[in-house]
Amino acid sequence: MAEDTYEEECDYLFKAVLIGDSAVGKSNLLSRFSKDEFRFDSKPTIGVEFAYRNVHVGDKIIKAQIWDTAGQERFRAITSSYYRGALGALLIYDITRRTTFDNIKKWLFELRDFANPETVVVLVGNKSDLRQSREVEEDEGKTLAESEGLYFLETSALENVNVEEAFLVMIGRIHEVVTQRIASENKSNGAATPHINGNGNGTVLPVGKEIVNIHEVTATQPLLSSSSNCCFK
C-alpha cells in the first residue's frame, strides 16, 4: 500500500475532536492514530493541534481531521471554534486519575452545549497499560457510557491497544448517522435520489459532512507527517 500524504486526494473530509482533562493522553492517542508514534516526552498542548488520517469507507477515501486542544482552563476561549463543525468526539479520561473521570460529565455538558446534537461520542479510558495504578474500574466507564448513550473503550496509546478501534468506531457511526439523516431529508423533500456532486461520486452536504451509503470502514496506513498547529484569538 502506498504511503499516505496530506496532499493525497480524498473524496470527503470531516472533523472530529478530542476532549478531556490535561495529561489524559489526548496528544499521544492522536499521534498513535495519525502517525503510529508514541512520544514519551509529550508536553501539554498549547492552543490547538490537528492531524489528518485517510480512512477507507467502501471505495471512498475520507480524510479525517482530528483536533486536539489543551485541557487547561486558560484555553477555554477557543471552545466555540474548536467544536464548530465537529461530527465526532473522543471523550477521554485517565484510568489512573479519578478526577479526570469525575470531570467527564463536565466535558460532556460542554460538548453538548457547543456541538451539533448528532455528534458521535466515544468514551475512552486511556492508559490501560497502567493496570497497577488503576483508580477507575472498567465497569465504571461502561456504566457511565450506557447511562449517557455513548460508546466505550479502554485504550493504551503506549501499547497501541484499541486506539485504532476507538477512532474507527467513531467514524463508522458518523457514517450511519449522516446517511440516515440524508435518507430522511430526501424522503421529506420528495427526492428520489440524493443530490450528486459534479463527478457523480457522492452525496453533497456542507463541508465536513459528506458521507456515502456504504458498510465498510477501514483505515489506511498512518500518515508519516500530518500534524499542524493553530491558535484562535
Swiss-Prot record:
The way it spans or sits in the membrane comes to: Lipid-anchor
GO annotation, biological process = protein transport
Does this UniProt record's set of keywords contain Lipoprotein?
yes
PROSITE patterns in alphabetical order: RAB
Chain ranges for the short sequence motif Effector region as given in the UniProt record? 42-50
GO CC annotation: plasma membrane
- InterPro entries per UniProt: P-loop_NTPase, Rab_GTPases_membrane_traffic, Small_GTP-bd, Small_GTPase
Q: Quick one: which residues bind GTP?
A: 20-27, 68-72, 126-129, 156-157
- Spell out the subcellular localization from the entry: Cell membrane
Q: What SUPFAM superfamilies has UniProt attached to this entry? A: P-loop containing nucleoside triphosphate hydrolases (SSF52540)
Lipid-carrying residues in chain (S-geranylgeranyl cysteine): 230-231
Primary place of residence? Answer: membrane
Query: Which Pfam families does this UniProt record tie to the protein?
Result: Ras
A GO molecular function assigned to this protein is: GTPase activity
**Which keywords are on file for this protein?**
Cell membrane, GTP-binding, Lipoprotein, Membrane, Nucleotide-binding, Prenylation, Protein transport, Transport
* Purpose: Intracellular vesicle trafficking and protein transport.
The record's family statement is: Belongs to the small GTPase superfamily. Rab family.
**NCBIfam families, alphabetized:** small_GTP (TIGR00231)
Name listed for the protein in its UniProt record: Ras-related protein RABA6a
Classification from the root reads: Eukaryota, Viridiplantae, Streptophyta, Embryophyta, Tracheophyta
Q: Report which gene this protein is encoded by.
A: RABA6A
